[in-house]
Amino acid sequence: MKPVWILAKLTFREAMRRRIMLAGLLLGISFLIIFTIGFHYILAQIRIELDAEMPSQGMARIANAEIMNGFEIMGLYAVAFLSIAMAALLGADTLAGEINSGTIQTIVTKPIRRSDVVLGKWLGFAGLLGLYLLLMAGGVVLSVFLQTGYTPDNLARGLSLIYLEALVVMTITLLCSSAFPALATGGIVFGL
């Protein structure tokens, strides 16, 4: 089992150095900045309109909570999309690229089972996707909380479902990457 963890650690490090990860991080940070600024201005406009239309504090508070919940769900939906795209892009050329370049031959000649190689890559990418999802979802939730004081119910359940969705896409990507070239893998996964 030790070779699996070594390969997972090496896969994690390798993926962190790839340009696609840098692009994903820049895209994620850009999204968080735009979401925070947009949410601030939308929230200010909604509060002005709610105060004018609803003199009752109770009704205004309920409407405000519903609106905050809706915008937070929209932000988390975008996080889910970015996580799934990252899962598909990270694994698309992993095994196919190593097979084409011949680097996989130096790994599998060692006394390591092929299933350990694939499992190690899967665990490395799973850890990276989990970290990416936590950073992105944490940014959305923190942005909404700092501006409104609102925290959603069942956040852990929702994030775990987003993570499982990303893991399924990553698993399909690694499966296709072991049998097809990188371009075909990307086409299959994004076609799903």
Language model features by range: what are they?
Residues M21-I29, A182-L192:
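Pore- or pathway-lining transmembrane helices of multi-pass membrane proteins that form conduits
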Residues R17, N100, R113, F180-P181:
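A helix-boundary/kink motif common to multi-pass secondary transporters
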Residues M1-L25:
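Aromatic- and glycine-rich beta-strand/loop motifs that create alpha-glucan
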Residues I33-L89, V118-G186:
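Secretory targeting signals
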Residues D93-A126:
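Helix-loop-helix units of permease transmembrane domains in multi-pass membrane transporters
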Residues E14, G97, K110, V141-F145, ...:
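Transmembrane helix-loop junction
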